[in-house]
């Protein structure tokens, strides 16, 4: 707009009066009407892009001597403030001495400072205003509160709240709304509730502020209660209200209330085609009512990208991956273009199927249609590639990122963990720390398992200190991850200490503690914690049951396992396929193969886990034929494809009965018939198969033929075979590898020492013992359990402190005699050095350890 156009617009209105009156003696029309009409034009120019036109209007007013009164001057000042022209604003403010005219000029400048991000200047200008004796009004405080929130100045908010209360403005809905929103931003609920109660006239806007604040703070029950009070006060909800309450219904799965709200939306006449339709779709989807969601979707006159996204994300979050992909195809067919949110929601379904080619196709679509790769889509792509085993593609995406934040770093860390690249995962975390990005909860939960796997206890303690410093130690998910990390590092005492410190223990934390105790050779502690869990009022789930059954299997304690089995039947938990599979394992390890088979036969649903459990049970009891029959039944009749665990159990079964040919045949069948690549465990099992049969050359050739470096388990298996068959030369090769791969494992030192002792190489035995002392490796004593009259008794190898130790060893000698009659030939005790050979030790003190060695290897 030019100055000429302004003149043309107002010339007809001024012309009749110019003839009769000089401008200096203007009429009331010129004094009041013209400035007020021009003020509308000034308001229209209150935009940074229209600053030039605003200055032209100002010039027009000056040329025609229309400006000069406080009303017009304040409007001009407001225009400059809205345009962010602080130099012109300051000139007018001080030249025309608007400092004491009214509060409006001060408010204009304060709001302009806040709007343009000059937050400290806004607060400073407020205090300058107070120095000039100008009192703030209800328009002043919302801007100041907004500035304090942006500056994260919580004390400033408290100061403003006290000032508002002292001035009696806390009952004003606009001032109260700004303060309520500020306190809720910091997660405070008590103060906003008091402020809300003091407001005299509560309208829908302030109710929406309160309800959305409750939802943001996680006080979902307060949202429902507040909405009920709002309805009783006869305040009509609007679309914002319904969106908030429907989101709470979706989060808490309150489908009945959600359906009632749907009816209320229809009755109230709120625009259904707005955001409410998406909130309703999300609510029905999250509550698992996909039929209703689909009907609602089909009834819509138009479905935009957001609406399609609601349906796709609902299917994905409910685990219905195939349906989400079908809906995506339908979206493309209908001509609606997907956006970044669409693919961020869809990619987890691609990850579920681990289809790398499909992942690449989606990536190509994103690039071809120039869809913006924001942080969330980038992390979703990285996560999808990692889960589809496309590690190099994920690395390429990360390297091409212009900017990365904690979300992308977390995707990389968890992706490396998923693919077993633990060192890379740890290096990525170190990179995150190096670039001074603070890890969030998900990052910590992702990196703690890596530290546990790598046994990096020192780093784990440092990270635990960081967690305490940041106040994350009371979060259940992080607490569980810390417990898991310490347990994997062999520090169960610290794990239990962390568990005891948790202020709130949910079912996940209890399950984590039970599982770790069961896996760390402390099954009795696992059962004790399982009992404590029940006493504390936490309901058991399938994970709790499975962990406790594993502990019973490791003790073994068949009586307690039977009690848990009865509990499962009574509380309808016996239909869970994973719990039943653990039950099979428990009965088998307790020696009751018949009960294990009965559980398997009565299972309504059988998956690969349950078949593997029963195959392993038969194999461990030396029933290879039964294992093979079950294998063929699984493949041919049930149509279930065997996995890596299946073949591991079959080869292990062959190992138990010494059927080398059958074991080798199944090992080859893995790759040739099923395309399954053998892992370290399979090679270790084949080495053990050859080793037990005395075919050490073939065992060593198997190790050398491995397509990847053998781990400590493989070399340890070979070393055990060398000790058994007195092959010192090959034992030297295996021991040198073990010293590099796992120098802290005492079991390998014992194997090496026994191999040398077999060959009467006492000097080498002494060296091994000295090496153990030098590296501070403590020999872990052997333990055994026996259950008598529903009570489990623990025995320690070589223990003479028990008051009835002489009677115990006498009984062991009697049992040894019975074993000899059955054909068992015990391995005589081999001393760690020649001087010890002069001492006499009862063989029975070492029977338990020697009998456990083959299973341990």
From Swiss-Prot:
One of its GO terms (biological process) is RNA modification. Signal peptide: none annotated. One of its GO terms (molecular function) is RNA binding. Residues 714-789 are annotated as: Type E motif. Keywords: Repeat. PPR repeats lie at residues 102-136, 137-171, 172-202, 203-237, 238-272, 273-303, 304-338, 339-373, 374-404, 405-439, 440-474, 475-505, 506-540, 541-575, 576-606, 607-642, 643-678, 679-709. The keyword Iron-sulfur does not apply. This is Pentatricopeptide repeat-containing protein At4g21300.
């Amino acid at each position: 707009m030019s100055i000429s156009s302004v003149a043309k617009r107002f010339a007809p209105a001024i012309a009749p009066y110019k003839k009769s009156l000089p401008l200096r003696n203007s009429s009331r029309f010129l004094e009041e009407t013209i400035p007020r009409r021009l003020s509308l034009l000034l308001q229209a120019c209150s935009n940074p892009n229209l600053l030039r036109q605003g200055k032209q209007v100002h010039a027009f007013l000056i040329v025609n001597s229309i400006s000069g009164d406080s009303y017009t001057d304040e409007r001009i000042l407001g225009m400059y403030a809205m345009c962010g022209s602080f130099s012109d604003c300051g000139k007018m403010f001080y030249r025309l001495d608007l400092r004491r005219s009214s509060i409006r000029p001060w408010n204009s400048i304060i709001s302009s400072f806040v709007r343009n991000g000059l937050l400290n200047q806004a607060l400073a200008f407020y205090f300058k205003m107070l120095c000039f004796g100008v009192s703030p009004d209800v328009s002043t405080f919302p801007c100041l509160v907004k500035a304090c929130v942006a500056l994260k100045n919580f004390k400033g908010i408290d100061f403003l709240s006290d000032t508002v209360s002292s001035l009696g403005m806390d009952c004003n809905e606009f001032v109260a709304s700004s303060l309520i929103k500020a306190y809720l931003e910091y997660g405070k609920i008590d103060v906003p509730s008091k402020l809300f109660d003091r407001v005299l006239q509560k309208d829908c806007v302030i109710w929406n502020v309160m309800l959305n604040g409750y939802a943001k703070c996680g006080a979902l029950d307060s949202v429902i209660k507040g909405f009920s009070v709002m309805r009783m006060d006869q305040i009509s909800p609007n679309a914002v209200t319904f969106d908030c309450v429907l989101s709470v219904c979706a989060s808490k799965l309150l489908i009945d209330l959600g359906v009632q709200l749907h009816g209320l939306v229809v009755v109230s006449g709120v625009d259904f085609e707005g955001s409410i339709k998406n909130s309703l779709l999300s609510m029905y989807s999250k509550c698992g009512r996909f039929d209703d969601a689909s009907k609602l979707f089909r009834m819509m006159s138009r479905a935009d990208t957001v609406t399609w996204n609601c349906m796709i994300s609902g299917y994905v979050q409910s685990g219905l991956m195939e349906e989400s992909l079908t809906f995506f195809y339908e979206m493309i067919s209908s001509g609606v273009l997907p956006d970044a949110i669409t693919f961020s929601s869809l990619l987890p379904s691609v990850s579920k199927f681990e289809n790398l080619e499909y992942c690449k196709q989606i990536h190509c679509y994103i690039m071809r249609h120039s869809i913006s790769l924001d942080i969330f889509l980038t992390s979703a792509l990285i996560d999808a590639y990692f889960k589809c085993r496309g590690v190099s593609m994920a690395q390429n995406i990360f390297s091409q990122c212009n900017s990365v934040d904690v979300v992308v770093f977390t995707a990389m860390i968890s992706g490396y963990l998923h693919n077993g690249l633990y060192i890379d995962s740890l290096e990525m975390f170190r990179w995150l720390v190096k670039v001074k990005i603070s890890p969030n909860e998900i990052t910590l939960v992702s990196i703690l398992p890596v530290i546990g796997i790598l046994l990096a206890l020192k780093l784990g303690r440092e990270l635990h200190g960081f967690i305490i410093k940041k106040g994350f130690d009371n979060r259940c998910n992080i607490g569980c991850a810390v417990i898991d990390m310490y347990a994997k590092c062999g520090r169960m005492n610290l794990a239990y200490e962390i568990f005891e410190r948790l202020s709130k223990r949910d079912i996940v934390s209890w399950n984590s503690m039970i599982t770790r105790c069961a896996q760390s050779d402390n099954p009795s502690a696992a059962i004790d914690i399982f009992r404590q869990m029940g006493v504390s009022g936490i309901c058991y789930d399938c994970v709790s049951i499975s962990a406790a059954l594993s502990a019973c299997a490791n003790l073994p304690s068949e009586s307690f396992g039977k009690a848990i089995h009865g509990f499962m039947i009574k509380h309808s938990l016996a239909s869970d396929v994973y719990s039943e599979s653990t039950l099979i394992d428990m009965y088998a390890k307790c020696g009751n193969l018949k009960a294990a088979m009965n559980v398997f036969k009565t299972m309504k649903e059988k998956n690969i886990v349950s078949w593997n459990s029963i195959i392993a049970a038969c194999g461990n009891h030396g029933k290879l034929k039964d294992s093979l029959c079950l294998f063929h039944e699984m493949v041919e009749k049930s149509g279930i494809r065997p996995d890596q665990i299946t073949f591991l159990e079959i080869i292990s079964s062959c190992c138990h009965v010494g059927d080398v040919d059958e074991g080798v045949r199944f090992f080859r069948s893995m790759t040739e018939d099923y395309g399954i690549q053998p892992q370290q465990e399979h090679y270790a099992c084949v080495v053990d198969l050859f080793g037990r049969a005395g075919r050490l050359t073939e065992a060593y050739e198997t190790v050398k033929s491995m397509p990847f470096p053998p781990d400590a388990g493989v070399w340890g298996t070979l070393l055990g075979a060398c000790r058994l068959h007195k092959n010192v030369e090959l034992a030297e090769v295996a021991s040198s590898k073990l010293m590099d791969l796992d120098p802290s494992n005492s079991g390998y030192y014992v194997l090496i020492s026994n191999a040398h002792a077999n060959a009467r190489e006492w000097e080498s035995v002494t060296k091994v013992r000295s090496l153990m002392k030098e590296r501070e490796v403590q020999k872990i004593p052997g333990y055994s359990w026996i259950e008598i009259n529903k009570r489990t008794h623990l025995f320690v190898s070589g223990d003479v402190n028990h008051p009835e130790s002489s009677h115990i060893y006498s009984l062991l000698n009697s049992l040894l005699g019975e074993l000899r009659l059955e054909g068992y030939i015990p391995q005589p005790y081999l001393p760690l050095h020649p001087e010890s050979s002069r001492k006499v030790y009862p063989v029975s003190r070492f029977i338990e350890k020697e009998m456990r060695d083959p299973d341990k290897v």
